[in-house]
Swiss-Prot record:
PANTHER family: GLYCINE CLEAVAGE SYSTEM P-PROTEIN (PTHR42806), GLYCINE DEHYDROGENASE (DECARBOXYLATING) (PTHR42806:SF1)
Subunit structure: The glycine cleavage system is composed of four proteins: P, T, L and H. In this organism, the P 'protein' is a heterodimer of two subunits.
CDD domains: GDC-P
SUPFAM superfamilies according to UniProt: PLP-dependent transferases
Classification via Gene3D superfamilies: Aspartate Aminotransferase, domain 1, Type I PLP-dependent aspartate aminotransferase-like (Major domain)
Record field: catalytic activity: N(6)-[(R)-lipoyl]-L-lysyl-[glycine-cleavage complex H protein] + glycine + H(+) = N(6)-[(R)-S(8)-aminomethyldihydrolipoyl]-L-lysyl-[glycine-cleavage complex H protein] + CO2
Origin superkingdom: Bacteria
Signal peptide start-end: none
Protein name (Swiss-Prot/TrEMBL): Probable glycine dehydrogenase (decarboxylating) subunit 1
Record-listed E.C. numbers: 1.4.4.2
Gene it is expressed from: gcvPA
Organism (species): Maricaulis maris (strain MCS10)
Family label: Belongs to the GcvP family. N-terminal subunit subfamily.
Keywords of this entry: Oxidoreductase
Length: 447
């Protein structure tokens, strides 16, 4: 098919149709300083070697997570990914695979999706899982919308300690629906404020554990109260490794479990792509309203076991107004990486990994708490916790960087204008005793 560019007349007609005077008006939300007035002055006729050197020089200005003591978390975690994972997902059968519309030629892809779903369901203590979402935030947002459809109610209550990005994603989706989201204060460690918001109009309650500050929550009581009012409970997690040690959401009464799977099989990747996990209880109402795709196991006409897309109520398959989401193909490769890594770990390996993460975090918390002026905020945590500093956390992080330490996420970056002296810190199996010692010494130096 030939490429036929739009004429000036075509462009004017399109701009007139949407009521915009010029193409520049389409980009008014982009700051002037970030816009290009013309072409970048790039060197021409460079060899491949010269281009590689130039790009390497540019990338060297970044501080790689592997090149410094790294304690940044808040939704994205540095874990070791076995070489086997990257090797297998680069096989052409997986790397170039498309949505398995034709099961007879897509059994490998469909089986891995089925295995992924099985692992997610087991991990979360749920009965059914879909074939993944874009990331944890979109999984959370879709869960809120699903709960509204199932209960036919329009009020969602979210704990303020749910990751702010997850809250914003949910609010964005709710903005174009009848759903209203009530967000409680993030400061209290208990769930009393959430419970107080639950009434007969509540569709769902959304709670994260471990939450954005690293605090662990027992969902049993809030689940009981929510269910008495006819509301669903959505449990959120940003650190999937925690489920190797912490009680699964399904075992604490949650109806839907959603979260980020990046910490298993997927690198930091400059913030994406990641893999959203989505699971729920075995209820026909839930399954029919679950977003995305579900791979199922069946028997063909010859009695052979096979795999197919059992449910796929996304907008590419059915009418847009009847679709439950618009999840697409590219999420599949990350879910494959997750499945391979989880298979390599096994149940015992995941528990060992989770325990190592927790022990490392405990050692770090002890070391930092010993620094004069530093107070540990958390009573409970998995591999992430928050400390209270005697000075602005944002400034402390910048000072730590000059010591070569990437020392966490200032809470004020997630809650502008609040928690200015609070620093959220994560520790994983990749952190060594030497890293912890360097961090503690550097922190003492900048305070």
């Amino acid at each position: 098919m030939r490429y036929l560019p739009h004429t000036d007349t075509d462009r004017k007609a399109m701009l007139d149709a949407i009521g915009v005077a010029s193409i520049d008006d389409l980009f008014t939300d982009v700051p002037e300083a970030a816009r290009l007035d013309g072409l970048i002055d790039l060197p021409t006729k460079q060899t491949e070697l010269q281009v590689e050197r130039a790009l390497a020089a540019m990338s060297s200005r970044n501080v790689a997570a592997s090149h410094a003591p790294f304690f940044v978390g808040a939704g994205a975690y540095k874990h070791h990914v076995p070489a086997t994972v990257d090797h297998l997902i680069q096989r052409s059968e997986f790397l170039t695979a498309y949505t398995p519309y034709q099961p007879e030629i897509s059994q490998g892809t469909l089986q891995t999706l089925f295995e992924f779903q099985t692992q997610v369901a087991l991990l979360t203590g749920m009965d059914v899982a879909n074939a993944s979402m874009y990331d944890g935030s979109t999984a959370c947002a879709e869960a809120v919308m699903m709960a509204a459809r199932v209960t036919r109610r329009t009020k969602a209550v979210m704990a303020g300690s749910v990751h702010p990005h997850y809250v914003e994603a949910s609010q964005t989706l709710a903005k174009y629906s009848d759903v209203s989201i009530s967000v409680t204060d993030a400061a209290p460690a208990d769930l009393d404020a959430v419970i107080a918001e639950i009434d007969d109009t509540t569709a769902c309650v959304v709670i994260q554990t471990p939450d954005i500050f690293g605090r662990l929550h027992d969902l049993r009581e809030v689940s009981r109260i929510a269910h008495e009012k006819g509301a669903l409970v959505i449990a959120v997690f940003t650190e999937a490794v925690s489920l190797g040690l912490v009680e699964a959401p399904g075992h604490m009464g949650a109806d839907i479990a959603v979260g980020e799977g990046q910490s298993i099989g997927v690198g930091l990747n400059f913030g994406g792509p990641y893999v959203g996990l989505f699971a729920c209880k075995d209820d026909r109402r839930f399954i029919r309203q679950m977003p995305g795709r579900l791979a199922g196991e069946t028997i063909d006409a010859d009695g052979r076991r096979g795999y197919v897309l059992t449910l796929s109520t996304r907008e590419q398959h059915i009418r847009r107004d009847k679709a439950t989401s618009n999840i697409c193909t590219n999420a599949g490769l990350c879910s494959l990486a997750w499945t391979i890594h989880m298979t390599l770990l096994g149940e015992k390996g995941l528990t060992q990994l989770a325990r190592l993460n927790h022990e490392t975090a405990c050692e770090l918390a002890d070391a930092l708490s010993a620094v004069p002026g530093v107070e540990l905020v958390n009573e409970t945590f998995f591999n992430e916790f928050t400390i209270l500093l005697p000075k602005n956390a944002d400034q402390v992080v910048n000072d730590l960087a000059r010591f070569g330490v990437l020392g966490g996420v200032p809470a004020s970056r997630l809650y502008p204008g609040r928690f200015e002296n609070y620093l959220i810190i994560a520790a994983t199996e990749t952190n060594t005793p030497e890293d912890i010692a360097v961090f503690a010494k550097a922190l003492a130096g900048v305070l």
